[in-house]
Amino acid sequence: MKTLSIDIETFSSVDLLKAGVYAYTEAPDFEILLFAYAFDDDPVKIIDLAQGDTLPHEVLVALTSSKVIKTAYNANFERTCIAKHFNLMLLPAQWRCTAVHATTLGLPGNLDGVAKALKLSAQKDKAGKALIRYFSVPCKPTKANGQRVRNLPEHDPEKWEKFKVYCIQDVEVERAIKNRISKFEPLESEHKLWALDQEINDRGVRIDVDLVKHAIACDEQYQAGLIAEAKKLTGLPNPNSTAQLKKWLEEKGLTISSLAKDKIEELIENTNDETVHRVLRLRQEMAKTSVKKYLAMEKALCPDNRVRGLLQFYGASRTGRWAGRLVQVQNLPQNKIEDLDTARNLLKGGHYEAIELLYGQVPFVLSQLVRTAFIPSEGNEFYVSDFSAIEARVIAWLAGEEWRLEVFNTHGKIYEASAAQMFKVPVESITKGSPLRQKGKVAELALGYQGGKGALIQMGALNMGLAEGELPELVKAWRTANKKIVKFWYDVEAAAIKAVKERKPVKLQHGLTFLYESGILFVQLPSGRRLAYAKPKLELDERFGKEALTYEGKLESGKWGRLNTYGGKLVENIVQATARDCLAITLMRLDNAGYKTVMHVHDEAVLDVPRGKNELDKVEAIMGEPISWAKGLPLTADGFVTDYYKKD
C-alpha cells in the first residue's frame, strides 16, 4: 500500500504544551505554515502555505483515501491540525504513528533521541527550536519590530528558507526511522487499539465550566485572605516572598536554612511564639496548589466545553500503559468527602465561606472536587467501571499461586485471605478493622514485586501502626505464603539473563517468552504483544556479587541512560502490561457494543451513556468476559452510575 510521510509547521497563539493540540487548533489565528511530504521513497517536497502555495490535488485526495497510509512522528498532531486547517474528516485507522512504533521498541519518545539511538545518517536539524520560536509562536511587540505580535516570512526571508529545510529534514528523519524499525511491525490489534485511542481523545470529555471557574475564584479569595492575614501579622509588603519572610523570621530569633515544606514543619515544632506559629501555618497554606488541575482544564478547554487529548497511547514505555496528559487524569486526588453533592453545590453557588465553615481547609475541598469537574454530555450519565484487584489477579495467574486464584474465584477478599495464609488463622476470624487485615493489606500492596522492608515503609506500614522491628518478619511470612510468586521472580530474571547471554528464546508458562533480536530483549506477553528492553547488557552487580541485567531507557531525570533491572521489576512490568492488555481488549469490546468511552484511568473505564438505559450490568459483564489468551484468569468488574466523575 502507498505511504504518505508528513511533517507540518504551524502557528497558533495558544500554548501547545499547556493546552494540547485540540485547543491549539481552535485558536482563531491557527494555521498550517508549511506542509512537507513524500510518497513512499520519493524526494521530499514542501508546500509553502503561508506564502500562498496550495496543496497538490493528489495529496488532498491521499489524505482521505483508504488506499494510502499516512505516517508522521506524533501523528495525532499532524492529523488533528490537517483536519482542522483543511476541514477534512481524517480517520485514525488510515494513519500510523512512528513515535508510538519507536516507543514499543524501547526507544526514546522524541524524534531527535530515536535518530541518535539508531545512529541514523539523517539527524534532526538542531536549529529547529529557534526557528519554531520565531515563526510558530507570537512574538513580543517592541519598538525594533514595529510593535508586531507575530513574525511572518517577509520579516526574515533567510530564516524562512531555513525553516523550510528544517521541515523537509523532519520528514527525512521520520521516514528513515520508519524504514529502520519496519521489520518489527506492531500487532494489527495494537494498531486498532491506537485508532480507538485516537477516537477517544478526539471525543474528549465534557467539563463543568461553572465548577472550574468557581474553584479558581474560591482559591483566589482564600489566598487573598491568607496574604492579608500574613501582612497584618508580619507587616511585610509581600509575606509570600521567601526572602522577606526569612528575614522576618530571623528577626524573631529563628535560624533559617530553608523554607521548604519539611523545614517549615520543623520550625513550627521549635517555636513557642504564637504569631510566628500562625505565620508559618499561613505559609504552608499559601504553598498548597489545589487549583493546578482546574487551571489545566481551563487552558485545554475547547469551545464546546470539552477537553481532549488527555491520554497518551503507550505513554509508559516499560508496560505499554497509557500516560496522562494536560490534566493528568491518572493522578487525581481520591474522594474523602462523603457528601460531594453539597460541596459541589456550595462551590457553584459561590458560597465560599460556607465551604470553609463546613469542611475546613479550602484547598482540601477544592482538591476533593477535581474529579467531579468531569461530567457527562447533555442528557447522559457516566458509567464508571473498573477491574477488581486486577494486578493481584494477574500475578496469581501468571505465577500459578493456586490459593490466591481460589480466593478470586470465590469471596475475593485478598487482604483477609493473605493475612490468614501468612499467620495461619481462619479467614473468618479476620474482620475489617483487625490488625491482621491491616498487615495483610500493606503486605499485598508492597511485597508482590520483590519489595522488602523498605517497600513496606514506603507503602506507609509505620503510619498504619506497625513497628519497624516486625517488618522483616512480615516480609518473610508473605514470601512463605506465596512461594510460587517468589519462584516466578527468580524464573523471570533467569530467563531474561539466559536470553541475552545465549541469544536463544526462553519460554515460561502462559506463552511468556524471552528473546533477543537486533540488540533488543523482547518479552512476549500472553497476549502476543512484546515488551522491549533496548541494548541489554549483563553486568556485575557488586551489591549482590552476581550477574545483573541492564538496558537503555529513560532515567528519572528524563535523560536517556542505562538502567538496572531484576526479577521483581521485570515481573511488575509483565503484570502491569498484561493488565493493560486486559483493559485494551475490554475497551475494544465496549466500543463494539456501542459504548462511548471518554476516559480510562489505570484499570477503569468511564463511559458516556444516554440517561436511563440501565445497562451497567451489561458493561460489568463485558468487562468480566473471559479472554482467549488468558484461560483461567478470573476477571470481575464493579461499576456505578453517576452524574459526575468520582471514586466510589
UniProtKB/Swiss-Prot annotation:
One of its GO terms (molecular function) is exonuclease activity. Its EC number is 2.7.7.7, 3.1.11.-. One of its GO terms (biological process) is viral DNA genome replication. The keyword Membrane does not apply. Pfam families: DNA_pol_A. Keywords: DNA replication, DNA-binding, DNA-directed DNA polymerase, Exonuclease, Hydrolase, Nuclease, Nucleotidyltransferase, Transferase, Viral DNA replication. This is DNA polymerase.
